[in-house]
């Protein structure tokens, strides 16, 4: 049988294959047999990691979310970050580059899984998507640090404008047919100024 994965990392190979299948053919097309075939392993091999399709889907969502959140945390805690504004800028850049480097993740998360978010800046919601909640908290911190008095409505609009810019740039960055002459690292930094 053809070996399409790195030995010892079948679980992650199955997750990546699952994301590709979902993005190409939809969630209904996902099966443990199909991810096994995509990885070039026996049909029984995925069962060592996932008892059923639902557990694979759950692992896909968890993996993508954790990878994304980890990137944002690294950005927010970077050595050049001195305040909330710096954190937001570096998180925004990392957000865009993460999805530029992982376009299948963007489609999976925002078009297939549809994570829950609340744009009310006055409180956290327990079901909010963790990376979004982190972004929202830093934006709230920025509003506090800036000393600018904003109404709840103005804060919510600020969140939507900021998130919309980053989300839109991430969507464009992940498109195969977009051929920018400037690197996305530079574009992300310049567009977020």
Locations of regions flagged by a protein language model:
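Helix-turn-helix
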Residues: 13, 17, 21-55, 59
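Amphipathic C-terminal alpha-helical segment
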Residues: 141, 159-181, 193
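Amphipathic alpha-helical linker/stalk segments
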Residues: 2, 62-88, 120, 141
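Amphipathic alpha-helical segments used for helix-helix packing
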Residues: 100-119, 171-179
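Amphipathic alpha-helical packing segments from all-alpha helical-bundle domains
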Residues: 73, 86, 119-146, 156-160, ...
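Hydrophobic alpha-helical connector segments
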Residues: 73-104, 149, 158, 162
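N-terminal intrinsically disordered/low-complexity leader segments
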Residues: 1-9, 20
């Amino acid at each position: 049988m053809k070996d399409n994965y790195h030995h010892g990392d079948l679980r992650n190979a199955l997750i990546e294959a699952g994301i590709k299948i979902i993005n190409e053919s939809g969630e209904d097309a996902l099966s443990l047999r199909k991810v096994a075939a995509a990885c070039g392993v026996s049909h029984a091999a995925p069962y060592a990691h996932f008892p059923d399709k639902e557990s694979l889907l759950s692992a896909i969502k968890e993996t993508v979310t954790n990878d994304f959140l980890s990137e944002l945390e690294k950005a927010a805690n970077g050595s050049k970050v001195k305040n909330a504004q710096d954190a937001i800028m570096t998180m925004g850049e990392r957000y865009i580059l993460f999805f530029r480097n992982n376009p299948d993740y963007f489609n999976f998360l925002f078009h297939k899984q549809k994570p829950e978010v609340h744009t009310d800046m006055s409180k956290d919601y327990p079901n909010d998507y963790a990376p979004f909640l982190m972004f929202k908290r830093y934006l709230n911190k920025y509003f506090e640090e800036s000393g600018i008095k904003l109404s709840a409505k103005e804060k919510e609009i600020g969140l939507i404008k900021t998130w919309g810019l980053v989300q839109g740039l991430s969507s464009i960055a992940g498109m195969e047919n977009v051929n920018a002459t400037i690197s996305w690292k530079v574009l992300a930094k310049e567009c977020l100024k």
